[in-house]
Amino acid sequence: MTYSLQMPRFSISQITTFAAPFADDVRAYAAAGADGIGIWEIKLREGGDGEALEQLQASGLESAAAVPAVPSILPLPLMEGPPEPAARIDAICASLHRLAPFRPSGVVCLTGPGSDRDTVVDGLRTIADEAAGIGLEVGLEPINRVGGEDWTMISSIPEAVELLDDVGRPALGIQFDTWHLWNTPTVLEDVERHVDRFVGVHVADWREPTRNWADRVLPGDGVADLPAILAALDRAGWNGLYDLEIFSDNGAFGNAWPDSLWDLDPDELARRGRDAFERVWAARIQRDVDRVSPGAL
């Protein structure tokens, strides 16, 4: 088994500090020692893209996977956007051009729920072609099978690969997410087999029992075997950013959890997130050795 001896590059997705404005996110993440930021288009105020880009460049942060304002081809619950797939595809393509100056590692895209695969395939081709024309990649994100019927038609890496192969566009890859895929029976094997198709990695842990999709916890605070997943990514050669993505509803999506991480100060949450990731990263070697040779270390 071969492992990186250095800390990987760590970033924080802006949804993690949901209520903070763009400038506060950049400052808090840089102060916490993060290497990058995952930009959400909803954090860019109208007419403020130039200022946001200057703030990003001055911070020295890299740009991880970005999330467009309309993130899926088919409509999603609780998220705004037109109901017609064609209009949603146009919106995603427009977002690609808006996000391109920030040079994200990829732009996240979901299928949306339902069974209209032909519309999704055609839409992904259009989106991938638009991305390729401006030097971007698109990351198709599988969504957790627990409650995923409201969000997606793919819930595993093999299902994503099959859809990618149907689309047949080199600018389309996979956005891996530990929260969504930790309970896939073959996740470790899937990571090692298909890591070369990943354009981004989201990291969060699974609360048990979980209360809904916006109830994620920091790495190490849940039941997902994150050390094993990070070890698999490390062995497979993933060298991109590990992007912390926390949804923790404080009432914004209808549930005001009393222990919502979104209620924390952005600086505190960024520091805690960084520390939590580093602890889980350090645990990956012990966990992987125990998996193949219990008690060897």
Indicate where each model-derived feature is located.
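Acidic-and-aromatic substrate-binding clefts and catalytic sites of carbohydrate-active enzymes
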Residues: 16-22, 39-51, 73-76, 113-119, ...
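Conserved beta-strand positions in the central sheet of alpha/beta enzyme cores
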Residues: 38, 65-67, 108, 139, ...
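N-terminal substrate-binding region of glycoside hydrolase catalytic domains
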Residues: 26-47, 67-72, 108
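Histidine-acidic metal/acid-base catalytic patches
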Residues: 2-11, 16-33, 94, 103, ...
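Short amphipathic alpha-helices and their capping/turn segments at secondary-structure boundaries
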Residues: 44-62, 93-100, 121-132, 186-196, ...
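N-terminal small/glycine-rich loop or linker at the start of catalytic domains
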Residues: 2-13, 65-78
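Residue-level detector of anion-binding/catalytic polar loops
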Residues: 35-36, 62, 105, 137, ...
